[in-house]
Amino acid sequence: MDNKIIYLTELDSSVDKSEPFVMGIDEAGRGPVMGPMVYGCCYAPISKSTTLKSMKFNDSKKLTEQQRDQLFDKMGESNKILAYETDVITAEILSEKMLYKKPISLNVISHESAIGLIRSVLKKGVNVQELYLDTVGPPDKYQLMLKKLFPEIGKIIVSKKADSLYPIVSAASIAAKVVRDFEITNKNFDYLNIYDQDEQLSTDFGSGYPSDPLSKKWLVKNRDKVFGYPNFIRFSWKTTETAMRGACFGVDWVLENDKLKQHFQENQNDKKRFMFFKENNIENCINDF
């Protein structure tokens, strides 16, 4: 099981969890070559919909950093109205899963995170009856999968631009974005430079998106010939592979079993046995090691 990094708030004890709730889910950091991808959810009683709209949540990408921080603080102070939960999927976990022998796609990782958040909220006894999500992959297929997994939720809508259409998804988007920014800005970059503890790692890496020239420059300047990069970087991204190719040492993996057989006797029974064992009819019961 992955070591989860979770940030959350809990509803005030005065809130009746049995009344119908609306829940929204969105992510931040899907595309960057560095740092975590964060999934966030927000949930509130449907009866508080008017209050939710008055809080003026919006797509986190359309807000300034200051506006996001202010709204996030307001969310933390409003546990009689709503609560949030986030799932931080580190670059290390993304690299590990996407570089398996049978790779797990980013879409599947995203779906698993969203499903995990839904299950977490339902486990708390929250009566979620409306669920809105920003799509990952084909909306209809994703929506059908969720309806089969959660038949107890009366209404499930998966759509493009959900963070601009539904305030509850906008709130989830803000939670995900602020938590991701916090994770990045509060990293100890000296620790991340595990290859040379005396050398400070530059934090001037721009947005972290593959198209950002500053991010590309950082990847070229900070690569190690043997280890490549600290685990803050997503090794499963094509941008990382391109930056390392030709500049870092390659590794040739021997996969064929027959190349290993030359070091061992194929038939252990062919080995000469001591006379003592033969005379006493003692057999070897272990054929493998």
From Swiss-Prot:
Signal peptide: none
Record note on cofactor: Manganese or magnesium. Binds 1 divalent metal ion per monomer in the absence of substrate. May bind a second metal ion after substrate binding.
S-S bonds: none
Annotated catalysed reactions: Endonucleolytic cleavage to 5'-phosphomonoester
InterPro entries: RNase_H2_suA (IPR004649), RNase_HII/HIII (IPR001352), RNase_HII/HIII_dom (IPR024567), RNase_HII_hlx-loop-hlx_cap_dom (IPR023160), RNaseH-like_sf (IPR012337), RNaseH_sf (IPR036397)
GO BP field: DNA replication, removal of RNA primer; mismatch repair; RNA metabolic process
Membrane-spanning residues: none
Keyword presence, Methyltransferase: no
Co-factor(s): Mn(2+); Mg(2+)
Coiled-coil zones: none
Domain of life from the UniProt record: Eukaryota
Name of the protein described by the UniProt record: Ribonuclease H2 subunit A
Organism: Dictyostelium discoideum
Gene: rnaseh2A
